[in-house]
Amino acid sequence: MELKNYLKKAQREKWAIGQFNFSTLEQLRGILAAVSKTKSLVILGTSEGESRFLGLEEILALVEISKMKYKIPAYLNLDHGKDLKWIKKAVDFGYSSRNLLILDNPLTYILSHFHTMF
């Protein structure tokens, strides 16, 4: 099921989906081990800096392998991305969602480029 469907279901049924950022394999394993005990789904986040440091391909591979190992639905979120080109690249690589931090970009710039990205 797509993340947006889970988000709608959670809102309708009044329950939450946890989102946890990770920057190491150990953190990812810890998050997924805890979530698997509750048989819940999870949103896994990386900041723009973390995703650049770890690499989008590597993050996606780690998450896909971990989803199979722990048998839970997990979705990737780019947390507080600033660079519109990097956000687009993350989505193209398989990130399910993104939070856009627009403090460093004028709103007119964001609006003029956003429609061409997604």
Give the location of each predicted region.
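Hydrophobic faces of well-ordered beta-strands that scaffold small-molecule active sites
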Residues: 16-21, 42-46, 74-79, 98-100
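N-terminal amphipathic alpha-helix/helix-capping segment at the start of soluble metabolic enzymes
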Residues: 1-19
